[in-house]
């Protein structure tokens, strides 16, 4: 079946692409295999599906993709007893009828030698690729359809809606970054003002404590002076007090003891 280029992607197509990629990643397959399955279902090339995933759909399912990778690692560890397991492809593209290939070859006036699909391994085969970081392996698998010589070169599908969405996201991110920068500057200024006010209040508290100490010392000194004055007054009153006399039976005056 010849796959025709289609510019319009619907929400159902994006949802199918996301669900298929997440399922392949979660069950230990590759994103490239998921692109092939979606391409056959939607009559699109795997290159178009890969470009749509990386350019538009992926950023909407980033958390789900990370969760799927985590579940895949746990599943592989459980099946392989802690050893890294090889990926298995969940989807096998339908075989091409040999008669169609012969008819196509007969119509072409000149046929150049190309590597056989059966005899040549894919550029980034999940089974023969050396063990590297899983996320890096996924990125290589998603780009292998663009680098493989056996895949027909297909122009990336970019619609006007994709361009507008990208520019809107870019402008929104730029405005958000500017707003965050302004908010950061405002918070820094407010923090500096609060620090200055705190230092001012601390200085006032120290001054009040010093004044209170001075007042306390003056009060104690005043109390001491008042006590001394009171004692002095009592002493003078005792000195000036007139003596008391008492007359006995014989008519003599006797000074009373104080």
Curated annotation (Swiss-Prot):
<keyword id="KW-0010">Activator</keyword>
<feature type="region of interest" description="Disordered">
    <location>
        <begin position="238"/>
        <end position="258"/>
    </location>
</feature>
<keyword id="KW-0804">Transcription</keyword>
<keyword id="KW-0238">DNA-binding</keyword>
<keyword id="KW-0175">Coiled coil</keyword>
<keyword id="KW-0678">Repressor</keyword>
<dbReference type="InterPro" id="IPR001005">
    <property type="entry name" value="SANT/Myb"/>
</dbReference>
<comment type="similarity">
    <text>Belongs to the RsfA transcriptional regulator family.</text>
</comment>
<feature type="compositionally biased region" description="Basic and acidic residues">
    <location>
        <begin position="246"/>
        <end position="258"/>
    </location>
</feature>
<feature type="coiled-coil region">
    <location>
        <begin position="177"/>
        <end position="218"/>
    </location>
</feature>
<keyword id="KW-0749">Sporulation</keyword>
<keyword id="KW-0805">Transcription regulation</keyword>
<protein>
    <recommendedName>
        <fullName>Prespore-specific transcriptional regulator RsfA</fullName>
    </recommendedName>
</protein>
<feature type="domain" description="Myb-like">
    <location>
        <begin position="1"/>
        <end position="57"/>
    </location>
</feature>
<dbReference type="GO" id="GO:0003677">
    <property type="term" value="F:DNA binding"/>
</dbReference>
<dbReference type="GO" id="GO:0030435">
    <property type="term" value="P:sporulation resulting in formation of a cellular spore"/>
</dbReference>
<dbReference type="GO" id="GO:0042763">
    <property type="term" value="C:intracellular immature spore"/>
</dbReference>
<comment type="function">
    <text>Seems to improve the efficiency of sporulation by fine-tuning the expression of genes in the sigma F regulon, particularly the timing of their expression. Negatively regulates spoIIR and its own synthesis.</text>
</comment>
<dbReference type="InterPro" id="IPR014243">
    <property type="entry name" value="DNA_bind_RsfA"/>
</dbReference>
């Amino acid at each position: 079946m010849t796959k025709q280029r289609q510019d319009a992607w619907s929400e159902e197509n994006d949802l199918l692409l996301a669900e298929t990629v997440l399922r392949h990643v979660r069950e230990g397959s590759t994103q490239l295999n998921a692109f092939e399955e979606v391409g056959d279902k939607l009559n699109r090339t795997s290159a178009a599906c890969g470009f749509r995933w990386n350019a538009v759909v992926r950023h909407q399912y980033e958390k789900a993709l990370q969760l799927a990778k985590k579940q895949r690692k746990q599943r592989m560890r459980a099946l392989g007893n802690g050893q890294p397991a090889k990926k298995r492809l969940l989807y096998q593209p339908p075989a091409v009828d040999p008669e169609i290939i012969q008819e196509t070859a007969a119509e072409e006036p000149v046929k150049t030698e190309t590597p056989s699909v059966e005899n040549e391994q894919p550029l980034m085969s999940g089974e023969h690729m050396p063990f590297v970081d899983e996320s890096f392996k996924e990125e290589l698998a998603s780009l292998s359809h663009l680098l493989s010589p056996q895949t027909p070169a297909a122009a990336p599908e970019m619609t006007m809606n994709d361009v507008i969405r990208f520019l809107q996201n870019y402008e929104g991110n730029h405005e958000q970054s500017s707003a965050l920068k302004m908010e950061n500057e405002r918070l820094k200024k407010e923090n500096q003002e609060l620090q200055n006010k705190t230092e001012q209040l601390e200085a006032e508290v120290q001054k009040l404590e010093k004044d209170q100490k001075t007042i306390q010392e003056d009060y104690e000194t005043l109390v001491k002076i008042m006590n001394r004055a009171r004692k002095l007054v009592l002493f003078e009153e005792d000195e000036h007090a007139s003596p008391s006399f008492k007359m006995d039976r014989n008519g003599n005056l006797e000074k009373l003891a104080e």
